[in-house]
Every structure is written in C-alpha cells, then in structure tokens.
Design a protein with these regions (language model features):
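Short alpha-helical DNA-recognition segment
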Residues: 15-33
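Residues in the recognition helix of alpha-helical DNA-binding motifs
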Residues: 10, 24, 35, 63
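Short, basic-rich loop-to-helix N-cap that marks the start of a DNA-contacting helix
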Residues: 38-51
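A short, Lys/Arg-rich alpha-helix, primarily the initiator
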Residues: 1-20
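Alpha-helical residues within the helix-turn-helix
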Residues: 12, 23, 51
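Short C-terminal boundary/hinge segments that cap the last helix of small helical domains
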Residues: 54-67
Length: 67
C-alpha cells in the first residue's frame, strides 16, 4: 500500500498545514481527505506536492507491503 506518512512528516518539519496545501499548492480539500484516508491520488497531485515543498517523491509517499 502507499502511505502518505512522509508527507505529514515533511509538512510538520516545514511548519505547513493542510491550509498551506490548499492555498499554496492548489490541493482540494477532497484530495487532502483522500490522502488522510490512505486512498490514491493522481500523479498531478503528487507533482504539485513535490513542487510546493521542493522535495523528492520519497518525501511525500512511501510503499509499505500489505501484511
């Protein structure tokens, strides 16, 4: 499964909030809800997050094998 834990950690380190994602990143509240629920998002969203935080994809998502 894909985990967004690295995103929340990156946001915490940089003092960002979900409001930051919406206003500066153009990420919708429904997309934020999907990420919080561990659901899939588009590659365009992942790209927008990488641009917003000037980071690598590994700072946004990670793969965790199903148990």
């Amino acid at each position: 499964m894909i985990s967004y834990a690295p995103l929340w950690e990156t946001m915490e380190r940089r003092g960002a909030t979900t409001y930051t994602l919406q206003v500066k990143g153009g990420i919708s509240s429904s997309t934020i809800r999907r990420m919080k629920a561990g659901e899939s998002v588009s590659t365009n969203t992942l790209e927008a997050l990488c641009k917003l935080f000037n980071c690598a994809l590994a700072d946004i998502v990670e793969y965790r094998p199903d148990e």
